[in-house]
Amino acid sequence: MGILNKIFGTYSERELRRVNPIVNKIEALDEKMQSLKDEDFKLKTEEFKSRLEKGEKLDDILPEAFALVREAAHRTIGLKHYREQLIGGVVLHQGRIGEMKTGEGKTLVATLPAYVNALTGKGVHIVTVNDYLAKRDRDLMAPVYEFLGLKVGVILHNLNNEERQEAYGSDITYGTNSEFGFDYLRDNMVVYKEERVQRKLNFSIVDEVDSILIDEARTPLIISGQGEKSTEFYKVADYFTKSLIAEKDFTIDEKANSAMLTDEGVNKAENFFKVDNYADAENMEIQHHVVQALKANYVMKKDKDYMIKDGEILIVDEFTGRAMEGRRYSDGLHQAIEAKEGVRVERESKTLATITYQNYFRMYNKLSGMTGTAQTEENEFREIYGLDVIVIPTHEPIARIDNADVVYKSEKGKFKAIVDEIVERYKKGQPMLVGTVSIEKSEMLSSMLKKKGVPHQVLNAKYHEKEAEIISHAGEYGMVTIATNMAGRGTDIKLTKEAEEAGGLMIIGTERHESRRIDNQLRGRSGRQGDPGESRFFVSLEDDLMRIFGSERIQGIVDKLGLAEDEAIESKMVSSAIESAQKKVEGNNFDIRKTLLQYDDVINKQREIIYKQRSEVLEGEDLKDQIRDMIRDVVYTAVNSHISGVEEEFETELQNLVNYLEDICLPKALVKVKDISNLSDEEIKEKLLEAVENIYSNKEKEIGEEQIREIERVILLRVVDTKWMDHIDDMDHLKQGIGLRAYRQQDPVQAYQFEGSEMFEEMIYNIKVDTVRYLFHVEVEKAPEREKVAKETSTNYDEDSVKKQPIKKENRIGRNDLCPCGSGKKYKNCCGRMA
């Protein structure tokens, strides 16, 4: 591979050779654009739109359009895209990922493809990781777009529906991945089409694309309502788990991040919970609570995985070190942690709507992305999203010096060496950014530096409100900044002249992350736009990566050398062993994400069908034919399922059939068994269908054409939403237990696909049955009103939260409340009779 690259160039180099002629055309138009008057820019936009309407393609107008944006940026914000940024713009327009190093002006690059694709009138979404960056980027670039005659909006978490509609109606919309995803889910829960906020998903430019499409890929967006289970069991399981002895009663698997009972632990569980067989299926709930309590107490670490703030458990994002308010672990783990820490245990939630980022972003007609680090995950981008990665050359050569890793025997020796290094460089005024993997480690390092009298600033989940401000000062003379992982990503670290003379920004990594990409991101904070800088990672054999995934070979080398605690080893062999450990973990994580996607694809196809049907109900003026089809399906299926063809049982089967249909759509005693006992199966179907259709026709006349059509819509929406929410729950339960199928020589994914498909077909039939049942029992005294099955009671999340979960509460109808179908009767005397 290396020899071929030397002869033909890398994939990126070959692709860039194709892009260069386009960039030459853009640069050649520079003089022409400079000669335009300010008022000509809006006219050019109208001209481009007109040319597109007449059949020209975006690629035909691209050179001129890019050149126009370039000049507009120069006149409005004083920035002119340089050649490398033009290359980046072309790559994004082509629906690819552009790897652009920190400080290369990604925000400015996005204006080029955003403008060109907005000319179609279908909208462009520019996606970033938090509200601060979305608003900042929109405010910075709005003058450029507005000068060109385009409207630009931003989606922030505190906007109301009208403001969201206006922002999405803009030509270009900035916002966070979670806001875009949640708005899609909410749009598919509305009861009037006018309440929707998003248009069809057209073109998306994802900033920090690796963070959103890979780090976040395993995290589903969930809109949830309050569950009904008691929380007492979590406290009981926690009490039991705290009485166990490590290794004797339970074991911990650090690679799998899990804990499980030993045989001795199982005996203790059976005695404690007073059950004969802990593994019995009827004790599944006990098993579930014990497993989560074990994980909460012995795997999840305070100030690393979560933190406590004002009596609330907040998840800490492992990639950014941010606390994610409003987001909760699913499947009872959050409740188990609450029980462990002695804070109030909240009830488990019920999922009302959910989607993963993988499936949300794959719905766009065209997807592109920017990041400083994508190449290490190129295979995943290509395989899952169909995106290739093109490395964009830097404007200035990178002057940063990346030193080899230094490896210590113990963590204590490593941190002592880090502090010595910081003290040494602080004396000469060199600014330093020190990356840690957890709040706990950053606070430990902070206290060590305080003892040495080194002034510094700490940036972790506890102080993220000041994130951008803290990080922007990190390049000043003598400034020492300790930050958890990728905190402050998206904010440039600019060097002062004195800091530059002191050697530029020094990056110190206190531990290797399990992903090379995260390490590269930390390194990339230094050496922006040709600035001087340096980086070095300090590693110990006690670090998680080395301990869990590192090879025994490294341990062997260190043992042979007989290193003391504070002695270091620096060798290429050690560095390559570390890299192979990282590759092993990355491959493992990719496989996990691929498998999860296979599961999610099952429910994703089902989601698309349900949301499409829902949309047709909202859009359609008349559901008459659809309802008639449902009535026929219910009657025909009832006949097929009740009549077996066994003569001796025919009379009994007919009676059961009549009873069944009387519960759904036939008035009592309208059809008697003797009326149909001499008919064939097909004649029975026709006779029953005729009777049922006549009843419905009379109901239409009685209620009135206009009113019955709205009632059909109200009832169908309500039934679809209720059944879909229950189905999500059922699919979740199926997935939780499906892994055990491997013991039966069954492929769990295939079993999930097959059984999930059967459950979906059953749900579709039940939607028909319930819709018909409600329609035949409805009596109207006032005009019906549509009502959401789930009402949003609060959206408790922080603007920087990457994985937000609005807490939505299911709207329960009291038995004495008015029935939502619009009959004017109490629920218990109307639709509640069938509930």
Swiss-Prot record:
Q: Which GO terms describe its cellular component?
A: cell envelope Sec protein transport complex; cytosol; plasma membrane
Q: How is the cofactor bound?
A: May bind 1 zinc ion per subunit.
Kindly report, in one word, the top-level EC class recorded for this enzyme.
Answer: translocase
Which cofactors is this protein said to need?
A: Zn(2+)
Q: How does it sit in the membrane?
A: Peripheral membrane protein
The record lists ATP as bound by 85, 103-107, 492
Q: What is its EC number?
A: 7.4.2.8
Query: Where Zn(2+) is bound, by residue?
Result: 819, 821, 830-831
Which reaction equations make up its catalytic activity?
A: ATP + H2O + cellular proteinSide 1 = ADP + phosphate + cellular proteinSide 2
Gene3D superfamilies registered for this protein in UniProt: Helical scaffold and wing domains of SecA, P-loop containing nucleotide triphosphate hydrolases, SecA, preprotein cross-linking domain
The source's superkingdom equals: Bacteria
Q: What is its main location?
A: membrane
User: Keywords in UniProt for this one?
Assistant: ATP-binding, Cell membrane, Cytoplasm, Membrane, Metal-binding, Nucleotide-binding, Protein transport, Translocase, Translocation, Transport, Zinc
Report a single Gene Ontology molecular function.
protein-exporting ATPase activity
Q: How does it assemble?
A: Monomer and homodimer. Part of the essential Sec protein translocation apparatus which comprises SecA, SecYEG and auxiliary proteins SecDF. Other proteins may also be involved.
What the protein does?
A: Part of the Sec protein translocase complex. Interacts with the SecYEG preprotein conducting channel. Has a central role in coupling the hydrolysis of ATP to the transfer of proteins into and across the cell membrane, serving as an ATP-driven molecular motor driving the stepwise translocation of polypeptide chains across the membrane.
For this protein, the record's NCBIfam families field holds:
PRK09200.1, PRK12904.1, secA
Can you say what this protein is called? Protein translocase subunit SecA
This protein's species is: Clostridium botulinum (strain 657 / Type Ba4)
Q: What is the lineage of its organism?
A: Bacteria, Bacillati, Bacillota, Clostridia, Eubacteriales
